[in-house]
């Protein structure tokens, strides 16, 4: 089933069928269909439904916030939510690794790099590197608030070069780590 495959679970499924009995429609939705259209159908109605599905997906991607991954029960299917949570888990588990890349993330969740990029973008409108950066910078802000020194924080979130870390921190938070401390 498409909705139970990590490679395709994010794809919208619309069933076009001549079976209009309520039991058939229920079965279609139980199988994971996002919409069920009985033939013959009105072309204008079909176009409206497709436009609405597309705009709903675009709106969800525009509103997407990495902090919402753990609170996104209604936005994603259970399968897609688990995929995003797995990504977050792997990133957090490798936070200190300065050589951690999207390729390593893909390998850890058993997907090809291109499939990971395509799926992640389809769900969030962003790239996995954005999630890696967000996770690192959010953790860095927490550690700075806990009074760790900037060079310690840099190492703890996967930056070997404190200057590069400070630049990335400022770009993400709008202020340098030393200003953020105050």
Residue map of PLM features:
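Basic/polar phosphate-binding segments, predominantly the helix-turn-helix DNA-binding elements
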Residues: 102-131, 156-176
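Alpha4 helix (beta4-alpha4-beta5 surface) of REC/receiver domains from two-component response regulators
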Residues: 9, 20-35, 48, 152
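The C-terminal output helix
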Residues: 51-66
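C-terminal output helix
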Residues: 24, 41-50, 54
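Basic, amphipathic alpha-helical hairpins
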Residues: 88-100, 120, 124, 141-149, ...
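Short amphipathic alpha-helix used as the core "switch/output" element in two-component signaling
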Residues: 1-9, 131-134
């Amino acid at each position: 089933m498409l909705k139970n495959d990590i490679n395709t679970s994010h794809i919208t499924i619309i069933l076009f069928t001549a079976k209009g009995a309520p039991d058939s429609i229920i079965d279609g939705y139980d199988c994971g269909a996002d919409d069920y259209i009985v033939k013959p159908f009105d072309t204008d109605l079909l176009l409206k439904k497709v436009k609405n599905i597309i705009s709903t997906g675009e709106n969800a991607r525009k509103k997407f916030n990495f902090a919402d991954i753990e609170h996104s029960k209604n936005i994603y299917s259970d399968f897609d939510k688990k995929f995003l949570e797995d990504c977050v888990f792997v990133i957090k588990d490798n936070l200190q690794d300065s050589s951690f890349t999207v390729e390593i993330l893909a390998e850890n969740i058993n997907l090809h790099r291109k499939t990971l990029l395509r799926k992640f973008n389809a769900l969030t409108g962003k790239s996995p590197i954005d999630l890696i950066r967000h996770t690192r910078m959010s953790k860095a802000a927490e550690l700075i608030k806990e009074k760790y020194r900037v060079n310690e924080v840099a190492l703890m979130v996967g930056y070997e070069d404190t200057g590069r870390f400070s630049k990335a921190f400022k770009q993400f938070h709008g202020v340098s780590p030393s200003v953020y401390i105050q």
